[in-house]
Amino acid sequence: MSLFSSLVHNVRGQLIARIISFAINMYLLRRINNDVLGLVNVRLTLLYSSILFLTREPLRKAEIIRGSLPKFINLLWLSPIISTVISVVCVYLWYAFSSTSDEVSWSVLLSFPISAIIESIAEPFSVISLRLESKCGSLAQHFAIGQGMLICVKRIFVLAGLFMFPGMYHLELFAYAQYIGAIAYLLFNFVAFYIYIRNKSIPELEQFSTFSDLFPKFSEGIDRDSIHAVFTMFSHSILKQLLTDGSAYVMTFTELLSLKDQAVYDAVERVGSIIVRTILSPIDENCNAYFSNTIRKESSVFNKNTDNHDDLVDTLSKVLHVVGVIGFVACTFGIPYSPVVISLYGGKLLSENGGALLLSLYSGYILVTAINGITEGFAMASMDNRQIFTHGKFLFVTSIIHLIINYVLCVYMNSAGFIVANIINMSVRIIYNWRTIREYLGDKCPSFTEVLPTGQTSIFLGVSLLATSFTYLLFATTPGLSYTLAHIAIGAVCLILTAQDTAQHDSVFTVIVDSLAKKHRD
């Protein structure tokens, strides 16, 4: 199965879930106390996401495919142990050094790390889904459905709980949602893979004769080089997490922002990251697996063609162009439509607390994070041990600088400083990653200008920015639904015309559109 087909399944699977979650969040912002949202969406969610990221990242990206399938499976089942150890450390840090423990009960606080541990039990199935490409696309669909279900179940439970248990404390409702979502996700993975193995419906899973082959066999042991690779990647993951969520750590362990301001920042970030989570994250996940599997020539567990570097370079070039165009489109339409989106999504809470400015800045962040996701995935897959060690030192230095910049800019710019700090951080990482890619590919390295839209698309984007900025000043600043709808309608026309021109005249997108059309006909 091609990388493009995997991406289609992943994006399509998560798109519906993100739309449902987005709609429910619109309601929750108007129904739940701002301080509760600040606690849950920033401090407690950071605890949960830190545990999951540090558990998942090493296993999904490290070079752990080394010839022995049982040893590979044994290594994957270290994920619950790793998650438990990380949870103990993180809970201590949150309890001792943040103010979260003063505002939530132990039962609520522990629900987030415990749910992360439950989800980590299903991590072996997720890694297998990412590492094995199925010709029929079932594994790509499985991963996308699982991630989408995890998102939806939690939000739907909270929404239903508000009506079914109106007297329940909202923090407890979020805690129960964590458990329900994690258990549903775990059961989905177990049941689905049991059916896959029993029915032998997926060719890549035929090497597992029984369902028990997916579980550890202690007599086989674990490959030492793979363990070393995981722990090396783990150290990188700690630094990457600090770089990725530096603003959330500053908010959690300092008192620079009130819980209300934290809720506003998180809500804006959720709106701004809808493109990141729905489109760019699935692209990153599939491309990271593709680059890792293709570049690692010594892998013999999976039957991969790892010799065709021309295809590798071509794929890198095309993916960079796709995410670059997506980022520029987000910038173009994000700036003039930020006030409208903020008003519709969060009402007065966001509109009256600088939400429009934050979302406009976030539009620029989307562009740099889109490029960084691809360049970093390729760079990490191509690094040898010496380069990985050097990269670790780079991340260590930049993570410290990033936290300092976050703190300083927050003092002077409030929450807007976090987004500016993230843009600076991502830009520096892109420069470092591109240098690594150039060293690996040499003369075959594509030009970095591949991220830019074509000249014709750039003209359409420029005209769209001017037109929508004018209509914002003309219509959106005037109270009244009809004026707002006029502003939205003109933007929709500009977006459709830009998309149509890009699909017809941009060679990369022309191939994508033709592939989608052919797949639909088949």
UniProtKB/Swiss-Prot annotation:
A single cellular component GO annotation: endoplasmic reticulum membrane
Parts of the chain that traverse the membrane: 35-55, 75-95, 108-128, 143-165, 177-197, 322-342, 354-374, 400-420, 457-477, 479-499
Example of a GO biological process term: dolichol-linked oligosaccharide biosynthetic process
Subcellular location: Endoplasmic reticulum membrane
Pathway the protein takes part in: Protein modification; protein glycosylation
A Pfam family matched in the record: Rft-1
Presence of keyword Transmembrane: yes
Topology versus the membrane: Multi-pass membrane protein
Keyword S-adenosyl-L-methionine on entry: no
Cross-referenced InterPro entries: RFT1
Similarity field: Belongs to the RFT1 family.
Function, as annotated: Intramembrane glycolipid transporter that operates in the biosynthetic pathway of dolichol-linked oligosaccharides, the glycan precursors employed in protein asparagine (N)-glycosylation. The sequential addition of sugars to dolichol pyrophosphate produces dolichol-linked oligosaccharides containing fourteen sugars, including two GlcNAcs, nine mannoses and three glucoses. Once assembled, the oligosaccharide is transferred from the lipid to nascent proteins by oligosaccharyltransferases.
Protein name: Man(5)GlcNAc(2)-PP-dolichol translocation protein RFT1
